[in-house]
Amino acid sequence: MQLPFPVAQDPDQHSLEKGRLLFAGDTEFVKGVVAMSGLPDPDRLEVCFAGRSNVGKSSLINALTGRKGLARASNTPGRTQEINFFTAGESHYLVDLPGYGYANAPVPVVEKWQRLLKQYLSGRQTLRRAFVLIDARHGVKKVDEEILSLLDSAAVTFQVVLTKADKVKEKEREKVLDQVRTALSKHPAAFPELVITSSEKGWGIPTLRSIITDLT
């Protein structure tokens, strides 16, 4: 039976406030990591963000934290090959994984990134959820399927976040939602709820904050 994968509902006032308070605290860049030996101590809960280059990952992290320049997008897709750690309040790490789907990156660079990603996803006990960002204009592409399968094999629960929802009309968005739901039905690690966001308009940002805050 195919799961319905409903869109996340607006949180209640209590959850909204919890989310607001978490992201109202200090949010700082901690470090960029290129090897497992460089990971910060696992003394906080972690959520990570994955997505194709140019899917709007940096914009989403900046919108969540209310810090415009916190996460910076590289001018060249796939240029940044680091796992970037940011604090959220006193209790969480936000982890920005390198963008994938970059056709021009050298093969050794891609292979090194893939090895590091597999090691991180499989070996980080404090990782509570991966948020996989999908462009609301395009849906799940083949390169997204690769990361979703990797999350399945690492047994890391992931939740799809649709980005740039303000760039597509509602009728077209519904078609994309159907395509995403069909794609996710094949992935056992998929959390059965979608989040629709627009960093530019602020859509879905309080909802995503609340989801992150409620993870334990």
Curated annotation (Swiss-Prot):
InterPro entries named among the record's database cross-references: G_ENGB_dom, GTP-bd, GTP-bd_ribosome_bio_YsxC, P-loop_NTPase
EngB-type G domain location: 43-216
Cofactor(s) for this UniProt protein: Mg(2+)
Keywords: Cell cycle, Cell division, GTP-binding, Magnesium, Metal-binding, Nucleotide-binding, Septation
GO annotation terms (biological process): division septum assembly
Gene Ontology CC entries for this record: cytosol
Residue positions binding Mg(2+): S58, T80
CDD domains on file: YihA_EngB (cd01876)
UniProt-recorded Gene Ontology molecular function terms: GTP binding; metal ion binding
Pfam families given in the database record: MMR_HSR1 (PF01926)
Annotated PROSITE patterns: G_ENGB
Record: residues binding GTP: 51-58, 78-82, 96-99, 163-166, 197-199
Job description of the protein: Necessary for normal cell division and for the maintenance of normal septation.
Stored HAMAP family: GTPase_EngB
Family in the record: Belongs to the TRAFAC class TrmE-Era-EngA-EngB-Septin-like GTPase superfamily. EngB GTPase family.
Xref: NCBIfam families: GTPase_YsxC
Protein name in the entry: Probable GTP-binding protein EngB
Organism: Roseobacter denitrificans (strain ATCC 33942 / OCh 114) (Erythrobacter sp. (strain OCh 114))
Native organism taxonomy: Bacteria, Pseudomonadati, Pseudomonadota, Alphaproteobacteria, Rhodobacterales
